[in-house]
């Protein structure tokens, strides 16, 4: 397979899989009337932005650099939200963006005069979420993200055209329905004054089993009831199962177990495997145990077990233990599946480890080098 020929580490995005996701997302927009935006925080692959732009209405950004990236690589609708905008950046953000969403009333009042040409919105803290982990719960206790309903009382909203909420993380249409119920209960008296409402991200639309028809109905019914334009801003759903991270075995050592050291890193290249945590699937291998050594399955006859580890000094830079049909050898390729979303955007050069190259497998089944990183990239960051 083509994996054997490439320089590692490398992310390989597959165009056909990306288009399949985008076709589904575009279909949701067409059937529901919602406008679907790409959330760059989860997927910002420069070589694929034009492809995504064929299907989605634009990008949602978290600050100046993402807004500039959206302008450079897609140049469609640009919606920008930040927990706190900076004085020296707001002017350029306003010039790039169509929508600007403020996180607090103080920020809205501070920058209203500098954003008069934009469609302005406020982020709502629904104070309700079904997020699977508190780390990813934007509506939890002491959350800095958004404005509570009680703080909307007696506020002049004449300059505000939209409301934004974000309360989901890799979740279902049922979860959105539950959040919408609370959102309408708490913020219903202001929704009718708006031109648009943004349902945020975290919608696992392209995952197998997601109830797409329910999502369409929720968006359409909401829009019809309140007379507003609905926006969705998936990130992970765009990049979901569209490509992999390819690494090579650099060394194999024995310490009670066979340990393969790879030219990649969970810490630097797959950080969510540590943060969530989760154990990545590997091509042509089975998971035996998680990185915390939690047993998942037993080793079968004629299989070979290896602990896959990263090439950094972090003791816990471990991917997990896996079963292979044959013994690994130095130079073998290890392919971590579904590693395009929330990886590239989070990469670090910890320990001076090489940034994985960015590659695209196009519709002709030809590999294109999108970004080939070098020492200079490390030097410029430090």
Swiss-Prot record:
Any Gene Ontology CC annotation: cytoplasm
Binding-site residues for substrate, renumbered to this chain: 236, 272
Enzyme class, UniProt record, top EC level: lyase
GO terms of molecular function: carboxy-lyase activity; diaminopimelate decarboxylase activity; protein homodimerization activity; pyridoxal phosphate binding
Catalytic activity, EC: 4.1.1.96
Species assigned in the record: Campylobacter jejuni subsp. jejuni serotype O:6 (strain 81116 / NCTC 11828)
Needed cofactors: pyridoxal 5'-phosphate
Catalytic activity: carboxynorspermidine + H(+) = norspermidine + CO2; carboxyspermidine + H(+) = spermidine + CO2
Name of the protein this chain belongs to: Carboxynorspermidine/carboxyspermidine decarboxylase
Lineage of producing organism: Bacteria, Pseudomonadati, Campylobacterota, Epsilonproteobacteria, Campylobacterales
Cell compartments where the protein resides: Cytoplasm
Chief place where the protein resides: cytoplasm
SUPFAM superfamilies, per database record: Alanine racemase C-terminal domain-like, PLP-binding barrel
GO biological process: lysine biosynthetic process via diaminopimelate; nor-spermidine biosynthetic process; spermidine biosynthetic process
Gene3D superfamilies for this protein: Alanine racemase, Lyase, Ornithine Decarboxylase, Chain A, domain 1
Pfam families: Orn_DAP_Arg_deC
Effects seen without this gene: Growth is highly compromised in polyamine auxotrophic bacteria, but can be restored by exogenous spermidine, sym-homospermidine and to a lesser extent by sym-norspermidine.
N6-(pyridoxal phosphate)lysine PTM positions: 41
Protein task: Catalyzes the decarboxylation of carboxynorspermidine and carboxyspermidine in vitro. In vivo, responsible for synthesizing spermidine, but not sym-norspermidine.
Sequence similarity: Belongs to the Orn/Lys/Arg decarboxylase class-II family. NspC subfamily.
Description of how the protein assembles with itself and partners: Homodimer.
Keywords: Cytoplasm, Decarboxylase, Lyase, Polyamine biosynthesis, Pyridoxal phosphate, Spermidine biosynthesis
